[in-house]
């Protein structure tokens, strides 16, 4: 989290997020349990709506590997699950669920990503597409 200022990455002050990644005995997929606090209180409905309507730069630029939508939220108490949800948007999307209030932080939730399609290979391809689209990698 943060922004670039005078060539230096300046960490963001908010939201405060704590996360723990859980590797389970499946071929692909990582679950992350996350806790978040916000400067301005947010309702569960507001958070889910922000997730559902979020568009990052890859979506706005309509990059070939960019998932549309980037995030999906599950209302079910047992989702996301690695075997069921890791391939969302060809493995490039992120699945979220189990959003609940928390006594220490404001909220907690579970996130799921495909560790090879989104993480390693697909993530590298998406970054290359972004760098090309922004002119950092010139066309030959």
Task: Give residue spans per PLM region.
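C-terminal substrate-binding/catalytic lobe of Rossmann-fold NAD(P)-dependent oxidoreductases
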Residues: 1-106
């Amino acid at each position: 989290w943060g922004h670039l200022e005078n060539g230096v990455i300046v960490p963001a002050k908010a939201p405060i997020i704590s996360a723990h990644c859980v590797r389970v005995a499946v071929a692909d997929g990582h679950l992350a349990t996350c806790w978040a606090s916000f400067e301005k209180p947010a309702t569960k409905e507001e958070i889910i709506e922000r997730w559902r309507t979020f568009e990052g730069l890859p979506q706005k630029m309509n990059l070939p590997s960019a998932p549309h939508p980037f995030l999906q939220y599950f209302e079910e108490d047992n989702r996301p699950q690695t075997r069921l949800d890791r391939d969302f948007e060809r493995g490039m999307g992120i699945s979220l669920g189990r959003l609940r209030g928390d006594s220490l932080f404001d909220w907690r939730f579970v996130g799921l990503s495909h560790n090879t399609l989104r993480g390693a290979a697909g993530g590298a391809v998406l970054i290359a597409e972004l760098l090309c689209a922004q002119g950092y990698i010139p066309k030959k």
